[in-house]
């Protein structure tokens, strides 16, 4: 029998009092992501009703998404360095973590927070769920033998409505994510981080009990092509699939619990941290910096190089400060279990 007291309230969406950030909080956030003055002059910031328009709402949506990806890391440090090893998806606590403490988070943290930011600016936002493709698995045997399959529901993204169509907004897939808003259209294809291309298709996934795979339930499938060609021989990598169904906080509570506690989860096994790199003059993302376990790599276009190899835990903590602007507290530095520490 559990010795915990019975809960008096369970997770839900508080429809009568939905989470929003104050104007002062939003201004603090825009400083954290270093949004340039030309975007701070957006008419949306003076009249929130304009957030629904493509003329005013879309440019600001693109800018905030890009600057967020380049200044708020995709990281799982809480699961390794914190004393509690737990994740919160409460928007109030996420503001404290991301804006006050200058940290980041995984998909559900980053996209819950950013969705709340956009709603606070007046945007119409729907939270959705996805399945990450096993072609993205960090485990070689899984990539080799199960690349055509998908995980269970373990990813979060946002849909933002502008005038007459939805736009996909996702800052929670690290270096393989779109990191730019794009329309929810079957067959849509665009360059994301040159020369990389992304596409969106509505199709059944391979796993289905349907007698004919083509009769399976269709999902929106987001794919990435790392090396586009002109002869039609492009290789598209399944990245994740998602549905337009609205997911609620209690859905993400279940999803986050699994991905943050399961010993087979990528997040519980490896320390990782990613920030995107942008060319501010061209207003586009050109690459990323990623820490994976003990190595930091910089990728610009299709060129990748090792920036730093960390031999000790002290070196990894210092690299988080110098390269990712992430400062762990003394408690966090001592929170990593001995068996996970670098020698």
Curated annotation (Swiss-Prot):
Pathway(s) annotated for this protein in UniProt = Xenobiotic degradation
What the entry lists under InterPro entries is as follows: Arylamine_N-AcTrfase, Arylamine_NAT_domain_sf, Papain-like_cys_pep_sf
The protein's UniProt keywords, in alphabetical order, are: Acyltransferase, Transferase
Effect of loss of the gene: Significantly reduced growth on medium amended with BOA or 6-methoxy-2-benzoxazolinone (MBOA) and no growth on 2-aminophenol (2-AP). Leads to the accumulation of 2-amino-3H-phenoxazin-3-one (2-APO), a compound resulting from spontaneous oxidation of 2-AP, when grown on BOA-amended medium. Results also in reduced virulence.
Q: What induces it?
A: Expression is induced in response to 2-benzoxasolinone (BOA) exposure. Expression is also induced in response to 6-methoxy-2-benzoxazolinone (MBOA) and 2-aminophenol (2-AP) treatment.
Bilayer-crossing residues are none
SUPFAM superfamilies hit by this protein: Cysteine proteinases (SSF54001)
EC numbers: 2.3.1.-
The record's section on Pfam families has:
Acetyltransf_2
Q: Name one GO molecular function term.
A: arylamine N-acetyltransferase activity
Q: Which residues form the active site?
A: 107 (acyl-thioester intermediate), 155 (proton acceptor), 170
Query: What family does this chain come from, according to its entry?
Result: Belongs to the arylamine N-acetyltransferase family.
The record's function comment reads: N-malonyltransferase; part of the Fusarium detoxification of benzoxazolinone cluster involved in the degradation of benzoxazolinones produced by the host plant. Maize, wheat, and rye produce the 2 benzoxazinone phytoanticipins 2,4-dihy-droxy-7-methoxy-1,4-benzoxazin-3-one (DIMBOA) and 2,4-dihydroxy-1,4-benzoxazin-3-one (DIBOA) that, due to their inherent instability once released, spontaneously degrade to the more stable corresponding benzoxazolinones, 6-methoxy-2-benzoxazolinone (MBOA) and 2-benzoxazolinone (BOA), respectively.
Name of protein: N-malonyltransferase FDB2
Source species of the chain: Fusarium pseudograminearum (strain CS3096) (Wheat and barley crown-rot fungus)
What is the phylogenetic placement of the source species in the record?
Answer: Eukaryota, Fungi, Dikarya, Ascomycota, Pezizomycotina
């Amino acid at each position: 029998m559990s010795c915990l007291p019975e809960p008096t309230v369970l997770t839900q969406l508080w429809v009568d009092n939905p989470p929003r950030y104050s104007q002062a909080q939003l201004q603090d956030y825009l400083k954290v992501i270093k949004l340039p003055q030309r975007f701070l002059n957006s008419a949306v910031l003076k009249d929130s009703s304009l957030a629904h328009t493509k003329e005013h709402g879309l440019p600001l949506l693109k800018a905030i998404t890009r600057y967020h990806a380049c200044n708020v890391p995709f990281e799982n440090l809480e699961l390794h360095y914190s004393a509690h090893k737990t994740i919160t998806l409460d928007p109030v606590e996420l503001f404290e973590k991301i804006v006050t403490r200058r940290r980041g988070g995984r998909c559900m943290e980053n996209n819950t927070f950013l969705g709340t930011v956009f709603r606070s600016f007046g945007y119409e936002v729907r939270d959705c769920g996805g399945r990450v493709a096993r072609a993205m698995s960090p485990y070689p045997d899984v990539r080799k033998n199960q690349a055509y399959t998908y995980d269970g529901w373990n990813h979060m993204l946002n849909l933002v409505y502008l005038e007459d169509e939805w736009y996909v907004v996702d800052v929670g897939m690290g270096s393989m994510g779109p990191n730019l808003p794009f329309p929810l259209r079957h067959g849509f294809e665009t360059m994301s981080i040159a020369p990389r291309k992304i596409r969106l298709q509505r199709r059944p996934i391979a796993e289905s009990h349907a007698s004919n795979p083509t009769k399976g339930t269709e999902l929106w499938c987001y794919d990435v092509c790392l090396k586009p060609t002109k002869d039609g021989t492009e290789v598209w990598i399944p990245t994740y699939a998602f549905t337009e169904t609205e997911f609620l906080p209690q859905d993400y509570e279940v999803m986050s619990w699994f991905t943050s506690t399961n010993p087979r989860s990528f997040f519980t096994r490896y320390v990782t941290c990613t920030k995107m790199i942008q060319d501010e003059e061209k207003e586009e993302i050109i690459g990323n910096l990623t820490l994976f376990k003990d190595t930091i790599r910089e990728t610009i276009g299709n060129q990748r190089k090792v920036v730093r190899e960390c031999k000790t835990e002290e070196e990894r903590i210092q690299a988080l400060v110098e390269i990712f602007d992430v400062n762990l507290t003394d408690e966090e530095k001592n929170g990593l279990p001995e068996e996970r520490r670098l020698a």
